[in-house]
A protein has these predicted regions:
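Charged, low-complexity intrinsically disordered terminal segments
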Residues: 1-432
Length: 432
């Protein structure tokens, strides 16, 4: 496995359920336990008014406005995500802007190259920005297919011996905007690894979003933010008309960008604020969980004040075992604080999702590690919509049925070599 880093918001989110017992050396099946959403309902927790309070705080913390009037469609796994993205490219009439960290050679990469080339041939302006490190293995033939049709394909921060530090600062954003009207973002890269149902070995589990409405302007800005590094052309007066985007739904959305600068960025601040604001439950799904001391402390403090904190992380099919080991060095303290940690079993878990109190959801490209919060360019959506948050909580519950929950007593008995590896990897966590 190489390194990597159709849907509805509030309709059917049911997936097939694994009936295996799932017992493993350090875990137990989560089947039979109370679901997060059921637990919240059992305690009579009301989400009424929570979103309004959280909106005020997050706006004050980040300074990023919250835009009402959007439609957010959840897309689960490649078998829903790729057809929706390809259809948007196929239907584009004026412009296609694609930004991605991963673009690998294969069937999926070929399908995207074909659709982008077809769009360019019919007169659509196609701008493709690939991270020079994440997409280093892309076949020249695929790039040539797009360029020969008229698409403008560029690479973000190619290696430069004059600026070696720059090589560690990548764009990890995943953005597609078509006709300045419809946008996509989430965790998916353009590669065969994501092409499937997320329940089969080798088919990565991920979550993406199709966005329409005024907040698409924020996604467009996150593309331009990286594009100008390679082109230095912010917009074309003769072409770009920046239309006023009409209301498309009932979701209020905040588009939060993370940049490769020292200190906490807006994404990091937003996550910490949400942890502090949580009253009932926090659900985190992430591919790479290596929290710093501050975030670890905030999660534990939330649990101690009665918040139900649950983490869903990769299991045996993790694509970066060294990052997983660095995160595992944190598990003992979390488990001792009565925070639930579950590991997804069927395939690599690559989604980046957080929900708080059943009313607010965060979906995007950023993981819960130092690289996402300090080294890389990222983009997340904060969605203020109980229907969207509830749908994601149901996805979380369903994924738990395919996961093993770590047992604290068994985790404490893991081998000395295992603990030593964790500590070694933990020492270099600032680069993960």
């Amino acid at each position: 496995m190489r390194d990597a880093d159709t849907a509805t918001a509030a309709t059917d989110t049911t997936n097939p359920t694994d009936t295996s017992d799932g017992d493993g050396p350090t875990g137990e099946s989560t089947d039979g336990g109370a679901s997060p959403s059921a637990a919240r309902s059992a305690h009579g927790a009301s989400t009424s008014g929570r979103a309004d309070e959280i909106r005020r705080v997050l706006t004050a913390v980040s300074g990023v406005p919250i835009t009402p009037g959007n439609r957010v469609d959840l897309l689960r796994n490649g078998d829903e995500i790729f057809p929706a993205m390809l259809r948007a490219i196929r239907e584009a009439e004026r412009s296609v802007d694609l930004l991605t960290f991963v673009y690998w050679t294969g069937d999926v990469g070929g399908r995207f190259a074909t659709e982008i080339a077809e769009a360019a041939r019919r007169g659509v302006r196609a701008r493709i920005l690939l991270d020079a490190l994440g997409a280093k293995s892309v076949d020249d033939e695929l790039v040539g297919t797009m360029r020969s049709a008229g698409a403008d394909v560029r690479f973000f921060r190619p290696p430069d011996p004059r600026h070696p530090i720059q090589a560690t600062h990548r764009t990890h954003r995943k953005v597609l905007v078509c006709d300045e009207q419809v946008g996509f973002t989430g965790g998916v890269g353009i590669a065969d690894e994501w092409d499937g149902d997320g329940r089969t070995s080798g088919c990565w589990r991920d979550t993406h979003v199709r966005l329409t409405g005024p907040a698409v302007a924020g996604l467009r800005a996150s593309f331009l933010d990286n594009w100008v590094e390679s082109d230095h052309t912010l917009f074309d007066v003769a072409f770009d008309h920046f239309p006023e985007l009409e209301h498309a739904g009932d979701s209020a959305v905040q588009v939060i960008k993370g940049t490769s600068e020292p200190g906490w960025n807006d994404i990091s601040m937003t996550v910490r604020a949400l942890v502090e604001l949580a009253e009932h439950d926090i659900r985190i799904t992430t591919a790479y969980f290596v929290p710093d001391d501050d975030l670890q402390t905030r999660l534990i403090r939330a649990r101690r004040r009665g918040v139900d904190v649950r983490l869903l992380l990769p299991g045996p099919e993790a694509d970066k075992r060294f990052v997983q080991l660095a995160g595992e060095a944190r598990y003992r303290e979390l488990l001792d604080a009565d925070i639930d940690v579950a590991c997804y079993q069927p395939s690599m878990l690559h989604a980046k999702v957080m929900t708080v109190d059943g009313s607010v959801a965060v979906i995007g490209s950023a993981n819960f590690n130092h690289r996402s919060t300090s080294l890389d360019e990222e983009v997340n959506l904060v969605v203020f919509d109980e229907d969207v948050a509830s749908a994601l909580d149901r996805d979380f519950d369903d994924d738990l049925r395919h996961s093993e929950q770590l047992d604290p007593s068994r985790w404490r008995r893991r081998t000395l070599p295992q603990r030593a590896l964790e500590q070694v990897m933990h020492l270099v966590r600032p680069w993960m």
